[in-house]
């Protein structure tokens, strides 16, 4: 099957020149930008010896060099995607001297005019200044990753925030539980008055099914659940993987219900409201959005070429939409064992990330609607996008030999959060039922393998149907074009048909 190509025309404005934010393979991106060369690829080419044969084929050394150049350029495209055909140069020039001068002047102003009487405010202002300068450095030095819309600086700042979050987790890992709680109290003193109610009962009176009770469960968190799954579908774009994650998350809730009481749910809440309504409709809507974006024609005009003010405003708003969108294929009938295992690993890592959310909230006693909890969810959701893109290229493109920087940092964040939970939740994990954990891991692996295998099998069947259709058509064409049986048509019609 051929990949559908959606990008039509070459973007000409600074905003338009931004590259494909889809999860298409790095090979497609390389073909779209043949003029861009990585550091290795832009080096002067060493003359290679040619064979004496008339074909003039390149020597094996030249072939190896070409292969290395392809590998280097593939990683550059997925790790720091360039922006071509820029027409508004001002927004894409570095401006490093100006940025340095403005940053230093701003810090000097606030350092001299602010009131320094309050020690807590001094500490908070110092931390904000550290974050500010770190993000400035990230804009200048960090890679923007595989995305460039609305601007590469946005993704560099996001990457800088992820590195700061990772460093914060490393700092918290070397503190004891009371110290960490004191830090949270310093950030928000209201947390002193909040405690997890371990005596509260969940999942009671499951036989009482009424419309009022069902409507009571459809609160703001249910809408968040639905939108979260729609966002996951846009990120992963594979029905089988999404349903594997959905089903296994319900199994995860059952397994860890003895540690997290809020995981206890009635059967109709877990099966109907969660799996079918929230998860199912969210997956359907997310994949539908992807389908619409794949079918859309992407033809960008420079903002300089637009004469009307309304058109310029509309074009500026469209800068926050993808430059193009391509269908992706996590699995195909010829997938290797390593690719098979990589997709299973993606499913399991997704479960760990979801578990970290609930364990962090439970161990450090925060309400579900607290700004730290909400902020972390939004940050993780944004940072997962380039990470999944880089992981997809690493899994599917044989020329990509190492994982992207954002994906590496995300993996470190996921593991650090899990370590922080285990270290500070000793009392909670002492009640862990080992048999439940062993069964959970076993079921995770079995269901992951089963869903991935079914996805490959389904792909094989679809390809067989597509390949068998032309053969059947060829067989039926001669039969339909042959002379009709005698006595059914007049000689004039037979002659016309012949």
UniProtKB/Swiss-Prot annotation:
* UniProt keyword list: Endoplasmic reticulum, Glycoprotein, Lipid metabolism, Membrane, Phospholipid metabolism, Transferase, Transmembrane, Transmembrane helix
Q: Which residues lie on this side of the membrane: Cytoplasmic?
A: 1-92, 144-153, 261-266, 361-367, 424-436
Q: What happens when the gene is disrupted?
A: Lethal at the first instar larval stage. RNAi-mediated knockdown in salivary glands reduces phosphatidylserine (PS) levels and depletes Akt1 from the plasma membrane contributing to cell growth defects probably by affecting the insulin pathway; causes a shift from phospholipid synthesis to neutral lipid synthesis, which results in ectopic lipid accumulation in third instar larval salivary glands; reduces mitochondrial PS levels thereby impairing mitochondrial protein import and mitochondrial integrity.
What gene does this protein come from? Pss
Which superkingdom, per the lineage? Eukaryota
Documented EC number(s): 2.7.8.29
Q: What processes does the entry annotate via GO biological process terms? A: phosphatidylserine biosynthetic process
**Catalytic reaction annotation:** a 1,2-diacyl-sn-glycero-3-phosphoethanolamine + L-serine = a 1,2-diacyl-sn-glycero-3-phospho-L-serine + ethanolamine
Q: What is this protein called?
A: Phosphatidylserine synthase
* Residues that carry a glycan: 205
Q: Where is the composition biased (Polar residues)?
A: 7-25
Q: Where is the composition biased (Low complexity)?
A: 478-490
Q: Where are the transmembrane segments?
A: 93-113, 123-143, 154-174, 240-260, 267-287, 340-360, 368-388, 403-423, 437-457
Report the locations given in the UniProt record. Answer: Endoplasmic reticulum membrane
Give, as in the UniProt entry, the pathway in which the protein acts. Phospholipid metabolism; phosphatidylserine biosynthesis
Ranges per topology, Lumenal: 114-122, 175-239, 288-339, 389-402, 458-498
Which family does the record assign? Belongs to the phosphatidyl serine synthase family.
Q: What class of enzyme is it?
A: transferase
* Species of origin: Drosophila melanogaster (Fruit fly)
UniProt-recorded Gene Ontology molecular function terms: L-serine-phosphatidylcholine phosphatidyltransferase activity; L-serine-phosphatidylethanolamine phosphatidyltransferase activity; phosphotransferase activity, for other substituted phosphate groups
Q: What are the boundaries of the region Disordered?
A: 1-65, 465-498
Q: What is its main location?
A: endoplasmic reticulum
| One GO CC term on file | endoplasmic reticulum membrane
What is this protein for, i.e. what is its function?
A: Catalyzes a base-exchange reaction in which the polar head group of phosphatidylethanolamine (PE) is replaced by L-serine.
Q: What is the protein's membrane topology class?
A: Multi-pass membrane protein
